[in-house]
């Protein structure tokens, strides 16, 4: 079976990851001891994508949990599903990374990385046909960003032909955790551009807005935010875990979404999102889901798709519905909003349908879009980065761990190049493209 190996790193990654496993266990009928207590054969049909079957009918998550301090892991272990993970798969240090990317990537993290890789290898050897890795981490701190990207590049070396999917929480514009977030995030993006295949971009502020405006929660907690993320993660992978009429896997997803290798940062959305009180006043229909899914307010990162154009997009529907209706609705969106899609990639929206809806809903949909407007986010981080870097503020924390200023300059220009690439394709039209080709041919001839 096509297994996926899940890795979570740092405080944020471990908290998102824990929530993800709660959702997945619930969907597959696995209780908190790892025993199956479900009611449908479909739950077990492809359970080995995410679980290993151990002796005595226990299902153990294919998960590796890492952190540079023990705190988050201890609370995870004592949480509702803490006993389900393999104890050897918890890998942690004692020192912490102190929100310093260099500590995570070069010093503290580098000391721990080999023991993490040993666990990853052990888990990979347990798979029949490993499809790829999914990594949960944040880019603002030290461990998830520094050590997370270190692990991603090491895995890249060892498993070059496997897919690498990340769920990356970007620093948000207004809600800041640490003052050095722009440094950590820029250094991480520099790595993710080169070493990851697909990045699902999340950000706390957008998630706060969804909780506040749409779900009408007065004081959203990180638990609420993580619940939104886990719903999306479950939606992205449901085609791999349940039978469906139009299935996709990590590689199909990449082939359909990534027109140029560096542009692999996606916006994600989820529908239906309604406040608890107004749930019963809305019908769940394919048109409803489609409309809400494409809504800018539903995007889980602080970039507005209306400020750019979609290169590609993919929609995953769950529940009993007609594929014909799904196709009609998706076509409808494209026809009505054709100016928001680049015209030089025809049929750039793909949909897939999985028969099993999430717990408590009759149908749902998950949206993944490759939009040029995501450059707004990189631009924002880059401006904050430049403001501090120009004055060399806080730099001694990084150079003290052996980093070179040159590395900062490279990361900065790589991020700016990425923004420029998005802008270039946002402005490109079908006619221009043909001219480019002629020029290139002439050069070759010359």
Swiss-Prot record:
Pfam families (UniProt xref)? Tubulin, Tubulin_C
Q: Which residues bind GTP?
A: 11, 69, 138, 142-144, 204, 226
Q: Where is the composition biased (Acidic residues)?
A: 429-446
- Principal place where this protein is found? cytoplasm
- Cofactor(s) named in the record: Mg(2+)
UniProt entry keywords in alphabetical sequence: Cytoplasm, Cytoskeleton, GTP-binding, Magnesium, Metal-binding, Microtubule, Nucleotide-binding
Gene3D superfamilies in the record, alphabetically?
Helix hairpin bin (1.10.287.600), Tubulin/FtsZ, C-terminal domain (3.30.1330.20), Tubulin/FtsZ, GTPase domain (3.40.50.1440)
One function term, GO molecular function aspect:
metal ion binding
Gene Ontology cellular-component terms for this entry are: cytoplasm; microtubule
Query: What's the subunit arrangement here?
Result: Dimer of alpha and beta chains. A typical microtubule is a hollow water-filled tube with an outer diameter of 25 nm and an inner diameter of 15 nM. Alpha-beta heterodimers associate head-to-tail to form protofilaments running lengthwise along the microtubule wall with the beta-tubulin subunit facing the microtubule plus end conferring a structural polarity. Microtubules usually have 13 protofilaments but different protofilament numbers can be found in some organisms and specialized cells.
Provide the family line.
Belongs to the tubulin family.
Q: What name does this protein carry? A: Tubulin beta-3 chain
**Species of the source:** Eleusine indica (Goosegrass)
Q: Which gene encodes it?
A: TUBB3
